[in-house]
Amino acid sequence: MPLRSGGLDAYGATHIGKVRSVNEDQFLIASLMKLVEIEQTSLQDSDLGQLTGPGRAALLMVADGVGGLQAGEKASETALENVARYVTQTMRCYYTVDEAAEERFIEELRTAVMRTHEDVQQAGEAHPGQEGMATTLTLVNVVNRRAYVVQVGDSRCYLFRDGELSQITRDQTVAQDLVDQGVMSAVTAEHSPFSHILSSAIGGTASPEVYTLDLHTDDMLLLSTDGLTKHVSNVELREQLGSPDSAEAICNRLLQMALDDGGSDNVTVVVARVLEPPVED
């Protein structure tokens, strides 16, 4: 069911696609209101239950696993479950919009991601056939209409505001590194085999990047794995996110567009609309 708390109307969906035999993507949407209530997730038989943690907030995450057999699936599953636990603990460190508190909160988010990175590495080493498993991770923690975005890998976060679409995250791929160094053009990078090679990944070599932004009423957030952006252009994303429809309707349309264009990879989409703040008594 959609999330309609924490100041958001949010919905997520995932699909194996039309080519792959295993879905290695995962997503998670949670409200944090003195406890974490998992509203919707693709995780199977999750034992997360209710995790204590004060504060009113929302947590959105997507992950795209990498590895042979079912290792990628396990990596993305482990990452989301463990990050959810660590972020719950992190929320205790941040209650108000205070610069010093915010810096501590951001550092705690980085720590949560790096602890998860170590967990995935250890899980891979402990189970034959899962050595070297890794995953992307993109999360958005919304607290009091401020968004904290943490990214490892190339799963993206977009902001749609007043008709404009902005990519908040930077793809952590070899191709993007070459673009940043002036060695390759952005157009060439889109079709380069290096665009599929991660320069940072949970379980591999993780270098989490953190972005912060203030949110406005009717802003739209989009998190997705590359199974969406391989098939749906920025023009199409802008058109869909500009719709007044619910997050659920927009999410399902985007996923179907990727499938209709070929569905060459697993596809995972999370869409969230920022709601009008409640009237204070």
Sequence positions of predicted segments:
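PP2C/PPM-type serine/threonine phosphatase catalytic domain
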Residues: 1-281
